[in-house]
Design a protein with these regions (language model features):
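Bacterial Sec-dependent N-terminal signal peptides
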Residues: 1-32
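Accessory carbohydrate-recognition regions in carbohydrate-active enzymes
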Residues: 30-396, 400-452, 456, 460-486, ...
Length: 498
């Protein structure tokens, strides 16, 4: 079995390399023949083991990831969901996927039998999931829960069983995932069919601001329960209760604008169909020719997972919350969830082949983050720099976009590249002073990992400098990029700290 699977994965890898190396973006689209590629996606892959993968409803690169949240039981619950568990505490509107740290889980709804209920048992056998759609049949209360999403809004449909006495939900604004800790939260405005509020938290993202505007398909009464929870009771239990929730990092007014623009009506099935179409459009950019159904499923599932992030981080009116914490008016789509140490080697180069329409805005995002925080993003989450992982991974991503011709403001991009490489923090001061990172002077003792990453980033800066005719800079960074060789130990044949 092991050799069989190993052979399949090697063949799939080789097939991917041939595709990536042999076609332009146009031919990627021309090669796609199936109009229903979402049938080959299995969103459950990666939800067990150490996969940390999000399971729920979202669209490609969406700000909203609406899905089930389980209690945080340790490292393997970073996404808020793990296949080994069978307890739900809510359906939250924002989740991470594939990360090594847990956060988010914002604005969670939970159907309940009474106001004191805080969790529900469920069975994976009763789940139905595909790209853009998640559903689960619950027993206590007896309700069929369905979720779908757009870029900036979530859509829930609760169909209660014939034996249900009331259609009740609890909105939990205190609940979060992993490191997340709610600091300030409230429902600021309530009408018979709407709620608006905010949730500010501190976690992996040091200062996250989430605003929401929720609209109900029928009149509801809302009662505060304390500790960040509100009980919502619908007028008619015999009718499905639909909830549309717009999200924003700027204001609840913007959250309402996002909702009105993206889900103006109440046609749940149409929003599900639109999400499926959005996924098919992106998946159709690559067609693989194989009779191996396992390889096909692995490939399209991996491609699907590659589009959970980066996430849109600006509203339909162009406003976004910047890295300086201020609200900015942008004429571009701003992005966040930039896990760059993980993605600069493969996911971002893939974007330069199949998501070229996103690249000008991605470059603008990087340049504006530099202008607002003084350095290119390292690991950016909800407008916050986490500085997670080593190196300067924002440099190769932006440099690649410049070198491939997707950046209009080349001088602005080069300033961001150069100044990010010339900082003093994160060991860069030692690199400038000694030409390498001395193990005894670098407090994290991660000198080899950092040093190799910095050498690669310096080579990228040098290439852009050379292209722009900045000969002195090119020479300086080319020399600095050779620092990797200083860590090589000829006796052992390995890189070692010095």
């Amino acid at each position: 079995y092991y050799n069989n699977m190993r052979k399949k994965l090697i063949n799939l890898f080789m097939m991917t390399c041939v595709i990536a190396g042999g076609f332009t973006q146009t031919s990627f689209a021309q090669q796609a023949k199936s109009s229903n590629l979402t049938q080959f996606v299995n969103p459950r892959i990666g939800t067990g083991g150490h996969g940390h993968v999000f399971l729920g409803a979202n669209v490609p690169f969406g700000y909203v990831q609406l899905g089930p949240t389980e209690p945080s039981r340790g490292w393997d619950w970073c996404s808020g969901y793990h296949h080994s568990d069978s307890v739900l505490i809510g359906f939250g509107h924002q989740h991470l996927s594939g990360t090594g740290i847990g956060d988010l889980g914002d604005v969670a709804f939970l159907p309940v039998t009474d106001a004191n209920q805080k969790e529900i048992l469920f069975s994976h056998a009763n789940e139905n999931v595909r790209p853009g759609y998640y559903a689960v049949k619950l027993q206590q209360p007896n309700v069929w829960v369905e979720l779908t999403a757009t870029q900036r809004a979530g859509f829930q449909r609760y169909t209660f069983g014939a034996d249900a006495q009331q259609a009740q939900l609890v909105l939990d604004l205190k609940q979060g995932i992993g490191w997340d800790a709610a600091k300030d939260y409230n429902v600021d405005k309530i009408t018979s069919t709407t709620m608006a509020g905010h949730r500010f938290s501190k976690g992996w993202a040091n200062d996250q601001k989430a605003f929401f505007f929720a609209e109900f398909s029928q009149p509801v009464t809302v009662k505060p329960l304390g500790t960040g929870r509100w009980l919502i009771v619908a007028a008619d239990v015999t009718k499905p209760l639909l909830v549309k929730t717009g999200m924003s990092a700027v204001s609840s007014e913007n959250a309402q604008l996002n909702l009105q623009k993206e889900i103006p009506g109440w046609d749940f099935r149409q929003v599900v169909a639109d999400a499926d179409e959005a996924w098919n459009k992106e998946l159709a950019k690559v067609n693989i020719e194989t009779n191996d159904s396992v390889s096909r499923r692995i490939f399209y599932t991996a491609m699907y997972h590659s589009m959970t992030a980066p996430s849109v981080f600006s509203d339909v009116n162009g406003q976004y919350r910047g890295a300086d914490g201020k609200v900015h008016d942008g004429n571009f789509t701003n992005y966040t969830t930039l896990s760059l140490w993980d993605t600069y080697r493969a996911a971002h180069p893939l974007m330069t082949m199949i998501h070229t329409d996103m690249l000008p805005d991605m470059a603008s995002t990087f340049i504006n983050i530099y202008r607002q925080q003084g350095q290119l993003p390292v690991w950016h989450l909800m407008g916050n720099e986490t500085n997670c992982m080593v190196g300067n991974p924002g440099i190769p991503v932006l440099a690649d976009m410049v070198l491939k011709g997707y950046v209009k403001d080349k001088e602005g991009a080069y300033e961001a590249l150069k100044q990010s490489a010339l900082r003093e923090d994160r060991g860069l001061g030692l690199l400038k002073k000694y030409g390498y990172l001395p193990h005894d002077l670098e407090k994290t003792k991660e000198t080899v990992a950092k040093g190799l990453e910095y050498a690669l980033a310096d080579a990228c800066v040098a290439k852009v400098a050379r292209m722009l005719g900045k000969k002195a800079d090119a020479k300086y960074f080319e020399k600095r990029s050779k620092s990797y060789s200083k860590y090589f130990d000829k006796e052992t044949g390995f890189m070692r700290g010095i």
